[in-house]
Amino acid sequence: MSVLAHVLSADVEVSPLRPVTGPERPEGHQAAVLEHARSTASGLAIRVMMPGEGDDAVAHGVRDLVARVDPAVEADLLLDLGAVRADRPDAAKESLRALDALMPLMPWRTAAVLGGGFPDVTARLLEHGTAVEPRWDWLAWRELTSSTREFVRRLEYGDYGIDSTRGIARGPSSGKGGPPWGVLRYTTDESFVLMNVLTRGDDRAAAIRAVAWEILALPDFRGATAGVGEAWLRDCARGEGPRGTGNAAIWLRAGNVQHMTYVARSLQP
């Protein structure tokens, strides 16, 4: 605890970030974050993990943690749904039930619902070259925000980006080994579009550019001026030779940039 508390205290003057804790974190972590928030008046966030139907143990842990927050401290609520895909058709209803219990616990500064709907990228998913998967997380958000509950208008949206929860947990690739294929990604209103590309071989560059052209030809492509991600796809499609065709890290970055840009615009009133 003392090490974490020291790091937090040293960082408070140079960073606007708030420390995050939650009912599943060790007691020492919780205590350090609570003390930091009290002594610096910088606030904190409480992250509640809900990868499925909520349970009484989690609710009890949140209540205990909230009871230890200094009354003068501002707190943010992060309801983290984890992976939201086809096997969770009731994710919005689960969220509402959880929020019914969480929102009255204290006067939260902000409240956000987080989740990720991007599928696990596998050879089987891409065996036909292209896969189109529903944005289950976005569909759940739409259902959630259609509720007439008073607190819904205060909710903010949190997005895992255009990688699966497992992919995020694995971290970035070392660039060594791996399959002979990668993926270009694009986000439409209700779907994720994934297209298989080669990572090696004499035809690699030409094949990648051809796939980039396919994305540009999608009816839902927003145009090269929509953002940096779209501009990269255009430049990739129009280029020549291997330069500018990217690699796994660049494809993921371009995918995340176009996705987050589109999501941010979609959330504007």
Task: Identify the residue ranges that each predicted region occupies.
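Alpha-helix capping and helix-coil boundary motifs
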Residues: 1, 53-54, 71, 87-88, ...
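Active-site beta->alpha loop and helix N-cap motifs at the rims of alpha/beta catalytic domains
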Residues: 1-68
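Hydrophobic beta-strand segments of well-ordered beta-sheets in folded domains
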Residues: 15-19, 42-48, 72-82, 107-115
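Active-site beta-loop-alpha junctions enriched in small/polar residues
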Residues: 22-24, 49-53, 80-86, 114-121
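A short acidic (Asp/Glu
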Residues: 28-35, 56-58, 87-97, 122-129
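Short, conserved loop/helix-junction motifs that constitute active-site signature segments
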Residues: 38, 69-71, 104-106
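Ligand-binding grooves and catalytic loops that recognize ribose/phosphate and carbohydrate rings
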Residues: 54-83, 89-93
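C-terminal accessory extensions appended to soluble enzyme cores
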Residues: 92-103, 107-269
